[in-house]
């Protein structure tokens, strides 16, 4: 349920529009790492 939803959204994030700002990409990456690795 939750894990499948997370995986689905993680896949969608790989196809972001070209005009997505670096700041937004870094935010998404940080959230992804926090969800998969935890706080570092």
Curated annotation (Swiss-Prot):
Its main location: cytoplasm. Keywords: Cytoplasm, Lipid-binding, Transport. Residues 2-40 form the ACB domain. GO terms for molecular function: fatty-acyl-CoA binding. Binds medium- and long-chain acyl-CoA esters with very high affinity and may function as an intracellular carrier of acyl-CoA esters. This is Acyl-CoA-binding protein 2. GO terms for biological process: fatty acid metabolic process. InterPro entries: Acyl-CoA-binding_prot_CS (IPR022408), Acyl-CoA-binding_protein (IPR000582), Acyl-CoA-binding_sf (IPR035984), FERM/acyl-CoA-bd_prot_sf (IPR014352). It is found in: Cytoplasm. Belongs to the ACBP family. Residues 1-15 have a biased composition (Basic and acidic residues). It comes from Digitalis lanata. GO terms for cellular component: cytoplasm. Signal peptide: none annotated. The keyword Cytoplasm applies. Residues 1-25 are annotated as: Disordered.
């Amino acid at each position: 349920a939750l894990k499948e939803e997370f995986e689905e959204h993680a896949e969608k994030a790989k196809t972001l529009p070209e005009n997505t700002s670096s700041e937004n990409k870094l935010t998404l990456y940080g959230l992804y790492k926090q969800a998969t690795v935890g706080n570092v």
